[in-house]
Curated annotation (Swiss-Prot):
Zn(2+) binds at residues 56, 60, 79, 82. Belongs to the SEC23/SEC24 family. SEC23 subfamily. It comes from the Eukaryota. The lineage of its organism: Eukaryota, Fungi, Dikarya, Ascomycota, Saccharomycotina. It is a peripheral membrane protein. Coiled coil: none annotated. The COPII coat is composed of at least 5 proteins: the SEC23/24 complex, the SEC13/31 complex, and the protein SAR1. It is found in: Cytoplasm; Cytoplasmic vesicle, COPII-coated vesicle membrane; Endoplasmic reticulum membrane; Golgi apparatus membrane. This is Protein transport protein SEC23.
């Protein structure tokens, strides 16, 4: 089975599919033993079991799976993780080799259980900025009203608006519009929110009812109601929203208390619905300028912080704001509340400081120029996408456990989660990412959320080759399904352990998974380390990997060869070095936070597109589009290029193609093939947009156009103003840059890898 089949079957891709059997040998592989796992990956044939799982005795708690040894006569099973012998329950008495339950069938390495405990209905609390211009506010209101039709009728909904003040709208009050106003320059605790809203009476809806529905009665029912009871009132409030009345002078920014509004939203939820899956959805059209969490003062003469100021620690408000939002993130994760941030303006809204909110809770980040754009509208609509059974494709209040067999230990996780501080003997001393635990919490989880898990080989001493058992890993994901069921997704995988030096180790290397996993480590390091240090670390790891696994003679660069399953890895690292994930120049702190958030969320395929974008070429000589090198030599006057960077989709018309189009050849009947050529990349774009979240920015440009820079910045500059004609081909573009080319990069890599003193 190849790597893609493993991913299709279980949503798992390992960096190494054969693992060295000792810790010292495993450390020599350079790339850690690690895996990318998509817990809720959509599978059309996924067994959904309507009974409780059978778990091993404590402290193991691994779930019965197809790798267990089952003694049908004794009605017992042996756990492959701790080797304990367990009795099968009475309901398994009729099983035979021909009639096995799904969890014991070899092909069912991933199953999902529907648990008997009900889950509460989901909660959606909108937090809306009213300091917007009339056009932007109208577009936002209209689309929020349209979005109500996408939310399940039994979901609870609420609304908070903010400008200079924050207002909690009492949508349960029928007589007229009513709201509770909070000052925008003050930090409110959850207790103060509770008292001011009158929520300090005993509330009976903290525990789900029999059917799994939280009782929306008592004081909280004034603010959070089932959509079927509140849609009319909420629609009226949204349609009646007006621009914040606080006056704004020409030389000042609007007074915007974003931090206070978010704090009140979390306070309302944690006092009324603790540990119930909820989404706080923030729609912001500018920077917070008031109260806790402000990132810039109201005077326009004070510029918004840049990367340079943040690095030099001269950004006036950034550190305090970051600390404030980290405190909110901790509160949100404690009670299972996800925070989504939608930015609808050209300016920054403080995503850099707020990044801990979506990063810790699994919320979404969407960055667009205005709420009237298709990027915002399509992205918000896709958030509420339904599955084949018409349920929302999102889970709430999830926990994620990794159970390894005794041969492996868990080093950590990188993804949108927080530690549950569950320390046990399977936790490694080495920490990568969020470590020192084998259990994490995800307040929100979707079929797109992918997590990087890292492992350490436990054994210090080697074992004779024929006696090494395989290593097992079980991933357990408990979550609240949007149907108000609690579910458990179980994936169990086995990997061969082999002695150090075994050729199977090198042949089992998955260069695509390794590139994404190493990128996640680099991004995790970037939160605390200097950018140049991370670049040096990336280069050092690449050189060490090549020294270990390349075929070469010492001090002879011309003899350097990489096996086919290593050959693309240096190329991935070259494009990573040039990417917006590590190179923050020309990006705002908000943009950098957005890009890194998306990479830490997406699956392997989408992550690779972010690291090394794809480029397709269309021409009259080719019936089908052809993948071409991400290189300046691919730009030709009689070709159309389609670039997909995940964040941007760009159609680039060569000079000749653009001239023909401008002369209107596509409108003439005898040039129907040219009209089809112009249309072909647009049809491909439509296919790309179907599953993409958030919606990418679409760019249509020509050779010499100002927006062609988006393409040129991603291409390998093999033909520059400084290079001689040895590189490139006649008619290819010249890129004006001082960046080194892939050819130069590979030449230096080969020299350093074969050097005896390295």
């Amino acid at each position: 089975m190849d790597f893609e089949e493993f991913e299709e079957k279980d949503g798992v891709r390992f960096s190494w599919n054969c693992i060295p059997s000792t810790r010292i040998e495993a450390s020599r592989t350079v790339v850690p033993i690690s895996a990318l796992y998509t817990p809720l990956k959509e599978k059309p044939n996924l067994p959904v079991l309507q009974y409780e799982p059978i778990a091993c005795r404590p402290p193991c708690r691994a779930v019965l799976n197809s790798f267990c040894q089952v003694d049908l006569r004794a009605r017992a099973w042996v756990c492959p993780f701790c080797l304990s012998r367990n009795q099968l329950p009475p309901q398994y008495r009729d099983i035979t080799p021909e009639n096995l339950p799904h969890e014991l069938r070899p092909e069912c390495t991933t199953v999902e259980y529907v648990l008997s405990r009900p889950a509460p209905n989901p909660i959606f609390l909108f937090v809306v900025d009213t300091c917007l211009d009339a056009e932007n506010l109208t577009a936002l209101k209209d689309h929020l009203v349209a979005t109500l039709s996408l939310i399940p009728e039994n979901a609870l909904v609420g609304l908070i608006t903010f400008g200079a003040m924050a207002q909690v709208h009492e949508i349960g009050y029928r007589e007229c519009g009513k709201s509770f106003v909070f000052r925008g320059n003050r930090d409110y605790t959850a207790k103060q929110v509770q008292e001011q809203l009158g929520l300090n009476q005993p509330i009976g809806h903290r525990v789900p009812q029999q059917g799994g529905h939280p009782q929306a009665q008592g004081a909280a029912a004034r603010f959070l109601l089932p959509l079927q009871n509140a849609e009319f009132a909420l629609t009226n409030v949204l349609e009646g929203l007006q621009k914040d009345p606080w006056p704004v002078a020409a030389d000042r920014r609007p007074i915007r208390c974003t931090g206070v509004a978010l704090g009140i939203a979390l306070g309302l939820l944690e006092t009324s619905f603790p540990n119930c899956g909820a989404r706080v959805m923030l729609f912001a059209g500018g920077a917070p300028t008031e109260g806790p969490g402000m990132i810039v003062g109201p005077e326009l003469k004070e510029p918004i912080r840049s990367h340079h100021e943040i690095e030099k620690d001269t950004a006036k408000h950034s550190k305090a704001a970051t600390k404030f939002y980290e405190g909110l993130a901790k509160r949100a994760t404690t009670h299972g509340q996800a925070v989504d941030i939608f930015a609808g303006c050209y300016d920054q809204i403080g995503m850099h400081e707020m990044r801990s909110l979506p990063n810790s809770t699994g919320g979404a980040l969407v960055l667009c120029d205005a709420f009237s754009t298709s990027i915002f509208k399509s992205s918000l609509t896709k958030m509420f996408a339904r599955d084949a059974n018409n349920f929302l494709q999102m889970g709430f209040n999830a926990t994620f456990d990794v159970v390894p067999s005794k041969e492996l230990k868990v080093s950590g996780l990188i993804g949108h989660a927080v530690s549950m501080n569950k320390k046990n003997p399977s936790v490694a001393d080495t920490e990568i990412g969020i470590g020192q635990t084998s259990s994490w919490k995800m307040c929100s989880i979707t079929p797109a959320h992918t997590y990087a898990t890292f492992f350490e080989v436990a054994q210090q001493q080697g074992t004779p080759a024929g006696q090494i058992p395989p290593g097992y890993v079980q991933f357990l994901t408990h979550y609240h399904h949007s149907s108000t069921q609690q579910r458990l997704r179980v994936t169990t995988v086995a990997k061969a352990l082999v002695p150090g030096g075994d050729p199977h180790i090198a042949s089992s290397f998955d260069q695509e998974a390794a590139a994404v996993l190493m990128t996640r480590i680099a991004i995790f390091k970037s939160e605390t380390e200097d950018g140049n240090d991370i670049m040096r670390w990336t280069d050092k790891m690449l050189i060490r990997l090549c020294q270990k696994f390349a075929d070469y003679r010492k001090d002879d660069a011309s003899s350097f060869r990489l096996a086919h399953n290593f050959s693309l890895y240096p190329q991935f690292m070259f494009h990573l070095r040039r990417s917006q994930f590590l190179q923050v120049f020309n990006n705002s702190p908000d943009e950098t936070a957005f890009y890194r958030h998306c990479l830490n969320r997406e699956n392997l395929n989408n992550s690779l597109i972010m690291i090394q974008p794809t480029l397709l070429s269309y021409s009259l000589e080719q019936e089908q589009p052809v993948p071409v090198l991400l290189d300046s030599v691919s730009i030709k006057p009689d070709h159309i290029l389609l670039l997909d960077t995940f964040f941007h989709i760009l159609i680039f018309h060569g000079e000749t193609i653009a001239n023909w189009r401008n002369q209107g050849y596509q409108e003439k009947e005898e040039y129907a093939n040219f009209a089809e050529l112009l249309q072909a990349p647009r049809m491909e774009v439509q296919d790309l947009l179907v599953d993409r979240f958030p919606l990418p920015r679409f760019i249509d440009t020509d050779a010499g156009g100002s927006q062609a820079r988006f393409l040129l910045s991603k291409l390998n500059p093999s033909n520059t103003h400084q290079s001689d004609s040895g590189y490139g081909t006649p008619g290819s573009a010249v890129v004006l840059t001082d960046d080194v080319s892939l050819q130069t990069f590979m030449s230096h890599l080969q020299k350093l890898s074969v050097a005896a003193s390295s």
